[in-house]
Amino acid sequence: IMNVNQMENFVKKKKINYLLHIAGLSRPMSIHDKKFIDSIDLNIIGSANVVKVCSKFKIKLIYFSTNYVYPCKNGNYKETDSLMPINNYAWSKLGGEASVQLYKNSLILRLSMTDYPFVHKKAFKGAYSSFMYNKEISKIIPYILNERGILNIGGEKREIFKFAKKFGQNKIFPIKLKKIKNFPKDSS
């Protein structure tokens, strides 16, 4: 996503109508503090590059953002609610959203997507999310291809630790929320 010419050559060959932009820097969230330049390059500048290519070739762009762009205090957020990213990861995704918003043939998905099965050995107690597995999200995409604007997509609101215990393949150990700086308390 950093090389516009390479992306242009790819879409010319493939004759793409829709592009799902899932690329970028995501985990662990602390990497966005340590390597914030990479976060800027991939999640903001890289996303702007994707917008340029989609615009040039009139490709529908579907951008995977995060529900962490909301204040993450009370949950149950609507697309029209105020934004206040809680950490550098969320700020970088909101930066990507800014360029996508300029391109009207686009859809921004604000979601909390995770791998199936839950692969981590630790999960947060006292933090809530509306996680959906990537395979669940993939089943929704065909139904929203023609949507535009911003859509929040999420599953049932659950404590992250309980979600991990129910759907994880490993024994899950709890992490206390107060031990981690700027982790979203309720992004549902």
Regions found by a protein language model. Name each.
Residues N3-L42:
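NAD(P)H-binding glycine-rich loop region in Rossmannoid oxidoreductase-like domains
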